Amino acid sequence: MSLVPEASTSRAPKYCYFFKTLLVEELELETSYHNLHYGQCALIGRLAFKANQYRLENVRVKCLPKKYSLGEGTVSLLILGLTHDKVVENRVSTGRYCIVRGEVVLHNVQHPKGAKLTAGGVYDKINSLSNDPLAQKQYLSALLATYRPAIDLWYIQVIDRAEDLLTRRLEMRSLIEK
């Protein structure tokens, strides 16, 4: 698979103005950042605190066959903007299942206070380099080396029966996308 999208077939991503239900895996395992979800989303997972950062771990998706489903907690996504004070204020705690709403961003892991990027910004940059496929490839390689998907937190809430809720939301999503 090529890192460089075909300029003639690639379409600009449209910002998602509703909290589309996504899997933690869909964001964390995406390596083509120009294909990353652009905009708002809702994620269901288990809150974890690792390496001095709050993260949302994936939840096993019951409706998928085992060979297509990762075990719970296999991957996790950084939650930007979640502080100890917000954890206390929202009555959430590590190990609990949560729904997180926010915006998908790319976070610079080498310079955490650096600028955040979005799939729209990545697309625009790739398009600006459309006459230079080598520059496109170098740009995307540099992104993969320094940026990781994250969620810029807007809201977090503890939930019960996370697997069931996630399954139902994914079923609804598949009906809407048909």
Swiss-Prot record:
Superkingdom, taxonomy of origin: Eukaryota
One biological process term in Gene Ontology: protection from non-homologous end joining at telomere
Gene deletion effect: Lethal between early pupal and early adult stages. Frequent telomeric fusions in larval neruoblasts.
Leftover remarks: Multiple telomeric fusions result in multicentric linear chromosomes that resemble little trains of chromosomes, hence the name 'modigliani', the name of an Italian train named after the artist.
Protein name per Swiss-Prot or TrEMBL: Protein modigliani
Purpose: Part of the MTV complex that associates with the HipHop-HOAP complex to form the terminin telomere-capping complex involved in telomere maintenance and prevention of telomere fusion. Potentially functions downstream of mei-41/ATR. As part of the MTV complex binds single stranded DNA in a sequence-independent manner, protecting it from degradation.
Native source species: Drosophila melanogaster (Fruit fly)
Subcellular location: Nucleus; Chromosome; Chromosome, Telomere
Keywords, comma-separated and alphabetical: Chromosome, Nucleus, Telomere
Cellular component annotations (GO), alphabetically ordered: chromosome, telomeric region; nucleus; polytene chromosome interband; telomere cap complex
Complexes and interactors: Probably homodimerizes. Component of the MTV complex, composed of moi/modigliani, tea and ver/verrocchio. Interacts with ver/verrochio and tea (via C-terminus); the interactions are direct and require fully intact moi/modigliani and ver/verrocchio. The MTV complex is recruited to telomeres by the HipHop-HOAP complex, consisting of HipHop, cav/HOAP and Su(var)205/HP1 to form the terminin telomere-capping complex. Interacts with cav/HOAP and Su(var)205/HP1; the interactions are direct. Probably interacts with peo (via N-terminus and UBC domain).
Predominant localisation class: nucleus
